[in-house]
């Protein structure tokens, strides 16, 4: 009986861990090339399971692009030494990370009806250049690509 119970416990653990790995994988993102975006913070939400930065970037074509950038959870922000108010509206930051394989448009509604609610392209942050100019790792899924030659700079005309 104990052997059967033990096998069932192992089986349940293996089956349930797949969804956790899927949630924390970069399968949705194109990790073959890192992308860099520079813009102004519109909103920052330090929430679980992932923080969200709403960023506006002025392109070389003069158009403003909106980005929804996924970052670390609140406990990881704390481990990195950041307070929940580390980013404020108006801060200029640069982010390096990965775009989704498919175009994802989505909206996060703020409970405060007077707050801005933005729709933007989802972007997974790996490296940030903070308002004070310091670089900070925000991920561990290939940050080396943010320094590698050939990364895609969103400011470069296509």
Model-assigned labels for residue ranges:
Residues 9-19:
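Bacterial N-terminal signal peptides
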Residues 1-10:
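Bacterial N-terminal signal peptides that target proteins for export
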Residues 27-158:
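PEST-like low-complexity, intrinsically disordered acidic/proline/serine-rich tracts
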Residues 20-22, 27:
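Boundary at the C-terminal end of the N-terminal hydrophobic targeting segment
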């Amino acid at each position: 009986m104990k052997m059967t119970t033990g096998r069932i416990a192992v089986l349940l653990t293996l089956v349930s861990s797949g969804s956790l790995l899927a949630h924390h994988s970069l399968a949705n993102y194109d990790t073959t090339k890192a992308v860099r975006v520079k813009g102004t913070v519109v909103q920052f939400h330090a929430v679980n399971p992932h923080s969200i930065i709403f960023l506006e970037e002025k392109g070389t074509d003069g158009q403003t692009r909106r980005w929804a950038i996924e970052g670390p959870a609140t406990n990881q922000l704390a481990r990195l030494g950041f307070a929940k108010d580390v980013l404020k509206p108006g801060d200029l930051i640069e982010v390096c990370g990965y775009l989704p394989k498919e175009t994802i448009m989505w909206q996060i509604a703020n409970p405060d009806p007077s707050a801005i609610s933005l729709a933007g392209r989802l972007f997974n942050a790996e490296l940030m250049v903070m308002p004070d100019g310091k670089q900070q790792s925000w991920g561990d899924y290939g940050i080396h690509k943010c320094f590698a030659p050939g990364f895609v700079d969103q400011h470069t005309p296509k």
